[in-house]
A protein has these predicted regions:
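Extended, non-membrane alpha-helical segments enriched in charged/polar residues
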Residues: 68, 75, 176, 180-183, ...
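Register-specific recognition of a single heptad position within extended alpha-helical repeats
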Residues: 57, 64, 98, 105, ...
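Leucine-rich amphipathic alpha-helices with coiled-coil/heptad-repeat character
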Residues: 84, 91, 132, 136-139, ...
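A cross-kingdom marker for long, charged
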Residues: 191-236
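Sec-dependent bacterial lipoprotein signal peptides
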Residues: 1-26
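Leu/Val/Ala/Ile-rich N-terminal alpha-helices, chiefly Sec-type signal peptides and the beginnings
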Residues: 26-108
Length: 236
């Protein structure tokens, strides 16, 4: 009986030690994962340029639960890249293709399609920003991680969102005006003649209407270019 009690008393502290070692091992693992994630944010995400990298299987294992934190950044970044590539770069390409008056007609359908999609694009980006902000606000991060993550969040989410906000309205106004010019030229049919990279109308009234339509284009083009440049810089 005495021997049994002795073993019982001896076994209890051993179990306690094992529990302490086990728990401390868990805490160390979480700390290592957080440290690896912080290093990734500072040395990769902050220097990634236009596109955030997709996490590898090894990185997901290294970061553990912080993979979901990164998903907030990566998800919004993907939305912005899609908006720039599919929604706004086609506008830039069509605008750059307009070199002579005939090009207003050849580019009006691509520009009309782009203009029609810009409103939907603006709503999608707004929803993506709201979701990212909500997920960011719900995070409970350690003191060493939070300032680093917030810095990357500003670079990846806040700054691009602020830059895109004026770009889409500028693109809508500019593309709509370009389409109107192309439609007007097309409506004149064979009355219009193109000479030496210029355009001629049979009446002064037609010429005046054309000049009134192209009048706002210079300032609209400038506003769009400035907003586009700001957005490109913000996503790099």
């Amino acid at each position: 009986m005495a021997t049994g009690k002795s073993c019982s008393r001896w076994f209890a502290p051993v179990v306690a030690l094992l529990m302490v070692f086990s728990l401390s091992g868990c805490f160390d693992k979480e700390g290592d994962q957080r440290k690896a994630f912080i290093d990734f944010l500072q040395n990769t995400a902050m220097r990634s340029g236009e596109r955030l990298p997709t996490l590898t299987a090894d990185q997901k294992k290294q970061f553990g639960p912080f993979v979901s934190d990164y998903a907030i950044l990566y998800g919004y970044s993907q939305q912005v890249n899609q908006a720039m590539d599919s929604g706004l770069r086609p506008v830039v390409d069509s605008v750059n293709a307009i070199r002579v008056p005939q090009d207003y007609m050849t580019q009006r359908e691509p520009l009309r399609q782009a203009n029609g999609s810009l409103g939907v694009l603006a709503q999608q980006l707004q929803n993506a920003k709201l979701q990212a902000d909500a997920a960011h606000g719900a995070l409970k991060q350690a003191d060493d991680l939070k300032p680093v993550f917030d810095q990357v969040y500003k670079k990846v989410v806040t700054v691009p969102a602020d830059a895109l906000q004026p770009l889409i309205p500028a693109a809508q106004i500019f593309t709509q005006q370009l389409v109107q010019v192309g439609d007007y030229i097309a409506q004149q049919g064979e009355q219009v003649s193109f000479v030496a990279n210029g355009i001629q109308f049979p009446t002064s009234q037609q010429a005046s209407q054309y000049n009134a339509l192209i009048g706002p284009l210079a300032s609209q083009h400038q506003a769009f270019n400035q907003a586009w440049t700001a957005a490109v810089n913000a996503t790099q």
